[in-house]
A protein has these predicted regions:
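Short amphipathic alpha-helical interface segments
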Residues: 1-10
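Gly/Thr-rich phosphate-binding beta-strand-loop-beta motif of the actin/hexokinase/Hsp70
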Residues: 53-90, 191-205
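A short alpha-helical element within helix-turn-helix/winged-helix DNA-binding domains
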Residues: 9, 14-17
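Basic amphipathic alpha-helical segments that dock to polyanions
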Residues: 4, 15, 26-39
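Conserved phosphate-binding catalytic cores of ATP/NTP-utilizing and phosphoryl-transfer enzymes
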Residues: 41-66, 168-195
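Glycine-rich phosphate-binding loop and adjoining helix at the ATP-binding site
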Residues: 93-189
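Short beta-strand(s) of the beta-wing in winged-helix/HTH DNA-binding folds
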Residues: 11, 40-41
Length: 205
């Protein structure tokens, strides 16, 4: 599935060659994904190296299989986006933050996320939240940062407030992942730099 997201329309044999997974296993897994509506057969292409062989059947991502909410937490705003599983934005809103004591709390964030979730016209599969700091999977309650503004911001409280899978990651890592999946000029290996309050670099390989 990662190969299809990264490369676009691709044949089963090309997936097998790129991943070193056996063609039989690739065929079995992709057939199951087609049945589940994750992938669809987008057309055929000729194999230039083997003109006498069968045409390759290309697989692509079904854009309307699942819908997700993505959110970014920052000092100045909370943003919420509703997307399909190809990253197309269906709805988006931002809440500016003025009063730090009230707005920079997990309770206020939850209230705004619940508002956005209730307004969604489609069923949501999961929620992803980009953090202004690191996320520690062992001590998963707080944003790992030296910024005192987030010391009372409880990630565990946020996760427990919703009956959906909730995922956290550093905001620059999220930007780099988006670049990998959706940029038309993507490369297999690149560095993504973000200059803000500090400098952060994410390495994709």
């Amino acid at each position: 599935l990662d190969e299809v997201y990264t490369n676009g329309a691709i044949s089963r044999i090309d997936i097998a060659n790129k991943t070193n997974i056996t063609p039989a296993t690739v065929s079995s897994l992709t057939s199951q994904m087609v049945e589940e509506g994750l992938l669809y057969e987008a057309g055929e292409t000729f194999d230039k190296k083997n003109k006498a062989g069968r045409k390759k059947i290309l697989l692509s991502i079904c854009h309307d299989h699942s819908y997700f909410i993505g959110s970014e937490i920052s000092e100045r705003y909370y943003t919420f986006s509703l997307t399909d599983n190809l990253g197309k934005i269906i709805a988006q809103t931002a809440y500016p933050l003025v009063n730090n004591e009230i707005h920079l709390t997990s309770e206020y964030f939850i209230s705004k996320l619940q508002e956005f979730l209730l307004a969604s016209p489609v069923s949501i599969k999961a929620i992803g939240i980009a953090l202004p700091g690191h996320f520690n999977y062992i001590k998963a309650d707080q944003i790992v940062t030296n910024n005192p503004l987030w010391q009372n911001f409880s990630l565990a409280t946020i996760k427990g407030a919703f009956d959906l899978p909730v995922f956290f990651s550093n905001n620059v890592n999220c930007m780099a992942l988006s670049e990998k999946l959706y940029s038309p000029d993507k490369e297999d290996n690149f560095l993504f730099f973000n200059l803000a309050r500090g400098i952060y670099c994410s390495y994709v390989y």
